[in-house]
Amino acid sequence: MRLYLIRHGETALNVKGCYYGRTDAVLSEKGISQARYLKEILKEVSFDYIVASPLVRAYNTAQIVMEEREQEIFGDRRLMEQDFGIFEGMTYKEIQNTYPKELDAWNEEFSTYRIPKGESFADVRSRAEDFLRDIP
């Protein structure tokens, strides 16, 4: 089996340097161009199964890459990015100023620290492993 992992194209929140996992940001013009470029790179690749995060930026990237193919794209919440909880939508500087203790804890225990109202990296890994076990 060959597995292709593709990241979504750029969004305005990427440009601003914001942490966002669950915020449903749309692709920027550059992000759309990136997806079209990827479509060209992958045009000769045959896919048995296409799965994307249901968030607009990821799903639209998959739609652009696959737009001339007759394959269904399945959305799967387990592929969503990390839920950054109280950090969601903020820049690193904003997080430093607003939540310094939580940021220190996250930096010290990145894999296990659960951001308040969000997830830990271990949570994300668990979701991804669960998804991988279910690949047909």
Residue ranges and their predicted role:
Residues 10-61, 114-129:
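Loop-to-helix element that buttresses phosphate recognition and phosphoryl-transfer chemistry
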Residues 7:
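Active-site beta-alpha turn of Rossmann-fold NAD(P)-dependent dehydrogenases/reductases
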Residues 1-4:
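Extreme N-terminal starter segment of soluble prokaryotic enzymes
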Residues 13, 74, 84-93, 111-122:
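Hydrophobic transmembrane alpha-helix bundles
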